[in-house]
Amino acid sequence: FNSEIVIEPQVADLTPENAENLLAGAEIILDGTDNFETRYLINDFAVKNSVSWIYAAAVGSYGVTLNVIPGETACMACIFPDSPTGFVETCETSGILNSAVNLIAAVAATEAVKMLVGAEQKLRRTLLSWDVWQNERAELDASRPRSECRACGKRDLIHLAGEGRPHITLCGRNSVQIHERHRPRGRAEDP
């Protein structure tokens, strides 16, 4: 599409300890994560550093997407002040219809292109929810930040400070999250 765009893929868990390093220099962040805690971490980073990002999620037959433009639109914490508690649908518990993923990914990718080419007047300023099975589409106004918002209003970036919920739920049966093994200084690699 554009030879001037530089994409730097990273294989790493996004944590409060490495978020600044992994996301530094980004012009836009596209969410492809499977849990709210990581999304709140992205949101806190984006608010702190004035980086636009696009929240996108799908489960079952529906998906949602939200453009977050710090200082201009509502952020994720404006719309969802707290992580859901109790039972939360996941890909493992509810499955996922690939057409829901395709639709939300297409909308999010198109919004990213609009951001990158400077077509601000064409950007959607709503939380879009779309259920492809029920043929139901809904939008929630997200055109303005909330002054009482923890993140963008009060600048209380608890997830970036490592004060959010510690656990992460992954999609899929028997999913695991492998963390780098730390060795004492001076110890040689195991054969």
Regions flagged by a language model, labelled:
Residues 1-191:
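Adenine nucleotide-associated cytosolic modules
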